[in-house]
Amino acid sequence: EFKDLLDVLEGVAVKMLKIMEEECGDILSEFGIEKIAFGKIPRLTLREAQEIIFKEFGRDNRKEKDLTPQDEIDLCQWSKEKHKSDFVTITHFPTSAKPFYTMPDPKDPEYSLSYDLLFRGVEVMSGS
């Protein structure tokens, strides 16, 4: 199941960063790095994410096949404010924008079972 894959991948990212905070907390503090917000990671389809960008930030990218770097920054800001999470997972990018080996969603083949995991405005994991 795609959802199970996302559970594992999000879990790996969270665990990795929790260990980093535990083992390197003093160094992170020394450099003024803010503690990571580990709230429940919201999952949005690309279209849902673009709707949030439109409603919350006033940019209409709803016909685009991907997010802009500013979209990624803003979605992470939204996630932190609304969900107390520095992470957000974006799924279901258009099949036409992905490599041929990306699995189409059986429920809607126009979209793929692909994901980007964003952390503080940066795509840190991606796959299908």
Identify the function of each model-found stretch:
Residues 1-7:
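Catalytic palm subdomain of template-directed nucleic-acid polymerases
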Residues 9-117:
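Metal-assisted phosphate- and nucleotidyl-transfer catalytic regions
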Residues 2, 35-36, 126:
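Residues at structural and domain junctions
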Residues 121-128:
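Extended C-terminal subregions enriched in glycine
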